[in-house]
């Protein structure tokens, strides 16, 4: 009996794209394809998708950007070839190719086919090139790569950085499928803390629901101290009052370790809780070490309410060292009221 291997059409076409690239022994091969919805770029290294901001090859995170323009595609990939081997991958979103080079241009190709080819290339490439190839794959339109990315995240034969990048990209899909996959990765005790932590952080999206917060809270008692820090980070991104109240309760819980309480306080301050929640927290801190840490956390807010409380701590805390810490952070403020307060102290 002769066995016949039947490949899915997308796999066959991806191989076809690979053969076209392999025909170029030396030089640059480039091609273009449609970008997934919600993705845009500046035509160079900066890309935005939803709340995620990426500056290739090293910056991956969430927040706002000051991009002057953001083009909704297409995705442009350039592959460097030398002696019949691929030596580089580069990807841009938006913009257009230079007409001055002698690159082999394959034109517009199928986005799913390009994604399959590039996903395979990411697993085979070195550190820098794998980052570009994986990004180029997930930028593609008309293909769901969440299952593939999850397999990559679980594959211990791949480099740790690539596995963590795969988890990050799962989080950018922002749908029920990706959320379920992140839950599965975060709760899988067979995975190392780096992968689980990446999944927890990826759940801390701008649109995270109260159900997401509740799920993270249920995970919290069963994870390591390192992963608890990741839970605090993720929960802090929620605007729900329940998230703020929970972080506050952890800070006030004297059954928790000092490190855990300090981390919960830090992320309460870094997150979206109103400053008034931080101000009220002070009265629950009996430990001097926590009150010292509190002055730093409060100093990061840089609003009127936070400065008022810092001044109050500097004047009235029972511990001299805590008062000095508060004074130090007041001295770092550029608020004119801080300068006035320091000047008044000196001239008394």
Predicted segments with their positions:
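Alpha-helical adaptor scaffolds
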Residues: 262-270, 276-283, 287-288, 292-295
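Alpha-helix N-cap/helix-start positions at coil->helix boundaries
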Residues: 127-128, 158-161, 191-194, 225-226, ...
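Alpha-solenoid HEAT/ARM repeat scaffold
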Residues: 128-131, 164-165, 197, 229, ...
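Core register positions within helices of long alpha-helical scaffolds
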Residues: 136, 169, 202, 234-237, ...
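Amphipathic alpha-helical scaffolding segments comprising HEAT/armadillo-like alpha-solenoid repeats
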Residues: 111-123, 142-154, 175-187, 197, ...
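Boundary at the C-terminal end of the N-terminal hydrophobic targeting segment
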Residues: 12-14
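N-terminal accessory interaction module
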Residues: 16-119
């Amino acid at each position: 009996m002769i066995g016949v291997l039947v490949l899915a059409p997308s796999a066959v076409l991806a191989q076809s794209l690979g053969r076209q690239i392999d025909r170029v022994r030396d030089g640059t091969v480039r091609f273009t394809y449609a970008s997934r919805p919600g993705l845009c770029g500046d035509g160079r290294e900066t890309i935005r998708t939803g709340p995620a901001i990426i500056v290739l090859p090293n910056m991956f995170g969430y927040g706002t950007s000051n991009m002057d323009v953001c083009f909704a595609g297409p995705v442009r990939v350039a592959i460097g070839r030398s002696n019949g081997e691929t030596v580089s991958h580069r990807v841009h979103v938006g913009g257009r190719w230079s007409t001055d080079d002698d690159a082999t241009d394959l034109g517009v190709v199928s986005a799913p086919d390009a994604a399959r080819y590039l996903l395979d290339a990411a697993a085979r490439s070195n550190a820098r090139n794998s980052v570009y190839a994986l990004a180029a794959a997930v930028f593609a339109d008309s293909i769901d790569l969440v299952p593939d990315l999850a397999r990559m995240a679980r594959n211990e034969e791949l480099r740790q950085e690539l596995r963590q990048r795969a988890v990050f990209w799962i989080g950018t899909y922002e749908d029920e499928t990706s959320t379920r996959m992140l839950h599965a990765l975060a709760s899988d005790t067979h995975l190392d803390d780096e992968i689980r932590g990446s999944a927890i952080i990826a759940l801390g999206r701008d649109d995270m629901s109260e159900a997401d917060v509740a799920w993270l809270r249920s995970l919290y008692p069963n994870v390591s101290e390192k992963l608890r820090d990741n839970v605090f980070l993720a929960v802090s991104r929620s605007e729900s009052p329940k998230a703020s109240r929970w972080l506050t309760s952890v800070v006030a819980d004297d059954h928790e370790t000092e490190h855990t309480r300090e981390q919960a306080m830090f992320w309460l301050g870094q997150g979206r809780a109103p400053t008034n929640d931080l101000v009220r927290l002070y009265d629950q801190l009996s430990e001097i070490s926590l009150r010292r840490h509190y002055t730093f956390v409060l100093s990061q807010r840089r609003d009127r309410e936070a400065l008022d409380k810092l001044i109050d701590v500097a004047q009235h805390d029972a511990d001299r060292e805590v008062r000095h810490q508060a004074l130090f952070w007041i001295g770092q403020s550029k608020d004119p009221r801080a300068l006035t307060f320091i000047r008044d102290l000196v001239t008394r």
